[in-house]
Every structure is written in C-alpha cells, then in structure tokens.
Amino acid sequence: MIANAVAAVATAASQGAQVVCLQELFYGPYFCQVQDADYYSYTEQIPDGPTTQLLCEVAKQHGVVLVAPMYEEEQPGVYYNTAAVIDADGKYLGKHRKNHIPQVKGFWEKFYFRPGNLGYPVFDTAVGRIGVYICYERHFPEGWRALGLAGAQIVFNPSATSRGLSEYLWRLEQPAAAVANEYYVGTINRVGVEPLGENDFYGQSYFVDPRGQLVGEAASDTEEEVVVRDLDMGRLAEVRDLWAFYRDRRPDSYESLVKP
C-alpha cells in the first residue's frame, strides 16, 4: 500500500496539487477492526523510520507538502496514531498524535494507541499553516478551535470511518468546524470493505471552505479517488473580516469547558 500511496502523490502532483494528505494509517489495512497484538509490528519510529524517510524524498521529488498518518512507536510498548507533516522541500516538520481514542466494535483503538500528548500543533509549510485532526477527533469541537487559535489555515481530517450514523455526520461536522473556526478543512476517508472486518468505509473525501461550502464535489463512496481542489486562500481573510468570530469570543465565560 505504500507504493499505491506514492503513486497517488505523484498523480496529485501531476494535477497541480501542492499539499497532499493520505488516509488514516495509510500503509496498511484498518487493523483496529480486530484486537490482535500481531499488528503492533506495523509500528515504526517517526521521523526516523523508513516510511517517513521515504516520504521526505517523495515530497521533495514532487515539491508537495505531505501529511502522512502512520502507526508510531515512541518506545517499545508505547504506540500512537500519528500524522507526520513534511514540507515541500522534504524537510520533516513535526507530527500530530491523535488525542481522542475510540473503543467500540470495529474501532478497537485503545488496544493499539495511547492518547496523544503533543496537543494541537500547527505547522508552517510552503502552502500555509496546516493542522491535523485525526478521524474520531472530529467529534470534539475543542480541538478544532485550538487549531484555529494556533493560526491554522487548512486542517486535514484523515479518517477510517464506516457507514451508519457516521455517514450522516460526515457532511455536517467538518463543514460546521470550517465555519466556526474560519479555515479550510480537507477530510479524507477509506473506501470499501477490508478483509479484517465488516466495516464498510464510505469514502466521500472532500474539501470545505470557511463558509461551509464544498469546494467541488465529494469523492465517490465506492471507488478510490484522488481528490484535487483549488483552495482560494484569500477567502480566509474575507470571511474573517465579515464574521469576526475570533474577535467575539468570550474565553472568560468558558471555564466549565475545561473542567474534568
């Protein structure tokens, strides 16, 4: 699957893409459908592991910023669901570790991952300030806002999410987050049923602008697709001047939001 991802990056770059985000845990099946310690072997160091090093070369070759979600080993027995961010010159910029970890049928993630401990970093890249918010995290508005307060202009939501209530929410939560926080959101999903379980991943990757409008159409819900869209970064200033949500925040009244 690494070869497929590298080919997808090349395809996107050939169509003019300047930043590419891959799906959650991109280089293998979504193994969290089962609880099997054999999949601990999928971990690797970030950035010193072979996949990050390869992707640094790929990013430099194509001149694109890369967001690469992987299974990270910090030390033996300590694992995270992590996205590496690589600049267009091939320089590794840092990583986001998924903070919110689900544990329900078909998504046994607590068996594999510790909750992240790096907060909500935003990375200065060749295309602007980028944040990452992985899959299940999208249900938590606090992280979206933290990324906005840190200056994010584009937030990527790489996911592995399947049909059911989630499919309805897929068209609600990310546009709402884009509007409330006045940035672009790129949301990426797997497609189809994998041999490990019954999850039917519904694809439908898309970009949404800070007005809550889709940029072009969403991708197919049954076929893999490389989604390339043109984002007008000037729209960020237009929206923020019109809807001054950050000006009108009242953090002094939000104390209850951070109480356990």
Task: Name what the model sees in each region.
Residues 234-260:
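A conserved C-terminal secondary-structure "cap"
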Residues 209-211, 221, 230-233, 239:
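Structured C-terminal cap/extension of enzyme domains
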